């Protein structure tokens, strides 16, 4: 009997929440809410508007450095391996490549936003 009551309670609460979820959005309809929004750009305008190349380059640089950092995440588990020298050498090379890439971007003023 308790199982049936629990199922009925769950079904009734779920049904009420579904009805409320479909009913609430229809109360306040504004033009701003109905319009699509994508990264601050108007999606109905021309798709060939120029954008900042600096923004694109900083975004690509962030993506590359983020992927390199993601390669370092399994490092604590790799330190428990039997060949400690190879693990340490690999992590040192990875961090060195990351540091050299950062130094290269810094020297070529790739990280400066205004220019």
Swiss-Prot record:
It comes from the Eukaryota. Its EC number is 7.1.1.2. Keywords: Electron transport, Membrane, Mitochondrion, Mitochondrion inner membrane, NAD, Respiratory chain, Translocase, Transmembrane, Transmembrane helix, Transport, Ubiquinone. It is found in: Mitochondrion inner membrane. It is an enzyme of class 7 (translocase). Gene3D superfamilies: NADH:ubiquinone/plastoquinone oxidoreductase, chain 3. It is a multi-pass membrane protein. One of its GO terms (cellular component) is mitochondrial inner membrane. The chain crosses the membrane at residues 4-24, 55-75, 84-104. One of its GO terms (biological process) is mitochondrial electron transport, NADH to ubiquinone. Core subunit of respiratory chain NADH dehydrogenase (Complex I) which is composed of 45 different subunits. Interacts with TMEM186. Interacts with TMEM242. Core subunit of the mitochondrial membrane respiratory chain NADH dehydrogenase (Complex I) which catalyzes electron transfer from NADH through the respiratory chain, using ubiquinone as an electron acceptor. Essential for the catalytic activity of complex I. Belongs to the complex I subunit 3 family. This is NADH-ubiquinone oxidoreductase chain 3. It comes from Phyllotis darwinii (Darwin's leaf-eared mouse). The gene is MT-ND3.
